[in-house]
Amino acid sequence: EEHVMKKTETEKVQLIGAIGSPYTRKMVSLLRYRAIPYKITWGQPEVILPAMGLELPKPLLLPTFLFPDESGGMKAVTDSTPIIRRLEAMSPERSVLPGDPALAFIDYLLEDFGDEWVTKYMFHYRWHFETDADNAGTLLPLSYGVNLPSDMLKQVKTMATERQVSRLYVVGSNDTTAPIIDASFRRFLQAMEAHLEAQPYLLGSRPGAGDFALFGQLTQLVGVEPTSRAIAHELSPRTVMWTSVM
């Protein structure tokens, strides 16, 4: 997928990502809003980078950006928060970082909240409940190719679902914490519903980095996972539509 915005091919920001990755969705939306030319390769960086002769970044995350290094080659870089700051230094137009220091700090906290806490909602609702896990197990492999043969889809679904369900502990999701995570998600939606009645973005009339962080997670919570989608439609239709607007 290529987006040409009056710039040459060599000036495009390159990245590798996945439709089911909330951080990929966060950064693609940010690039589009900031009108930064980009070229995205949909796939797995652990497969794509070696084929390009590039070293894997540490840690290996989605999305993976490719930036020029000191030698004139390309280097794989991850972690969306510092990448946002790097992009600001490269292109200051349509900034997503508030100029006021106090607002900038609040925006940073909101971005961190989205990246580190709202992602717990996403992973919990994606894999904790059997219906949701079955849904994600089917859809996520297809995001890499809707023409995936049925027998291969079945194999990948089983492997991916077992692996991800076994990793629920990483975000602190289990039968004991499930009601706590659910209650937190519902409070978040209620707060968003009240807030969006007053203004269209978290800090005013245009989005900051925090908006894009929340958006990334909500693309999955509102758009993919059946349980969280139903809760969102019930408690905060404004958040549902805000996710589409973003």
How would you name each of these model-derived features?
Residues E1, E55, T227-I231:
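Short secondary-structure boundary/capping segments
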Residues V4-D151, L202:
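GST-like domain detector, emphasizing the conserved glutathione-binding G-site
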Residues K120-V245:
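GST-like fold's C-terminal all-alpha helical module
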